[in-house]
Design a protein with these regions (language model features):
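A short beta-strand-turn-helix
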Residues: 47-68, 94
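Structural microenvironment flanking redox-active thiols in thiol-disulfide oxidoreductases
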Residues: 81-120, 130-137
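Short pre-active-site segment immediately N-terminal to redox-active cysteine/selenocysteine motifs
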Residues: 66-68, 72-76, 108, 145
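Thiol/disulfide oxidoreductase modules built on the thioredoxin-like
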Residues: 117-122, 128-176
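Conserved hydrophobic/aromatic "anchor" residues
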Residues: 48, 72-73, 115, 123
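Conserved redox-active cysteine motifs that mediate thiol-disulfide chemistry
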Residues: 64, 72-89
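N-terminal targeting signals for export/organelle localization
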Residues: 1-47, 180
């Protein structure tokens, strides 16, 4: 009997290992998504107040009656920076329909202010610094990952959460706003 395996046997073995690795990756990510959508997250948004870039204390209930996209982000987070131009465009387009983006920056005022000016951010940004991670956990981000977004309906109920980049399609689907 040949103690060396044929190239076909090696290829099949490698293929099976790759399939197992892909399956394990998908199961892990599916569990992560399910963990974020468990019953531990309150259906109604938690209340909070934070200072904006001008130092004014803003309360989340100021935006009651609107669809809210609450986005936890930081200037040092590349995926956070990537999604902001889309948020700027959506805020401009859907503001008349009652869609309100609110940034919750896990950063200091100076860095956020400079970045907001450079990018032309047209929606409120609240400064949470490191305390923002705990606030994000109250909204269901058990991993402390950024970016993290929460979509809240007009009645103040959490209707969606997203760890990582939030797509325009998901926002429009959950808010039932129409894309022209």
């Amino acid at each position: 009997m040949n103690k060396y395996k044929s190239p076909l046997t090696w290829s099949l073995s490698l293929g099976v290992l790759l399939l197992l690795a892909v399956a394990a990756y998908n199961i892990d990510h599916q569990v992560s998504a399910e963990a974020l959508n468990d019953k531990a997250t309150p259906p109604t948004r938690p209340d909070f107040s934070l200072q904006d870039l001008e130092g004014e204390v803003r309360h989340i209930n100021e935006w009651d009656g609107q669809y809210i996209v609450l986005n936890f982000w930081a200037t040092w987070c590349p995926p956070c920076r990537k999604e902001i131009p889309e948020f700027i465009a959506l805020q401009k387009k859907y503001d008349p329909a009652g869609l309100q983006f609110i940034g919750v920056a896990i950063d200091d005022t100076e860095a956020v202010s400079q970045f907001a000016m450079e990018m032309g951010i047209n929606y409120p940004n609240l400064i949470a610094e490191s305390e923002g991670i705990e606030l994000a956990k109250l909204y269901g981000n058990t991993y402390g990952a950024l970016p993290f977004s929460v979509i809240i309906n007009r009645e103040g109920k959490i209707i969606g959460r997203q760890v990582g980049l939030l797509s325009k399609e998901k926002i429009l689907r959950l808010t039932q706003l129409q894309d022209d």
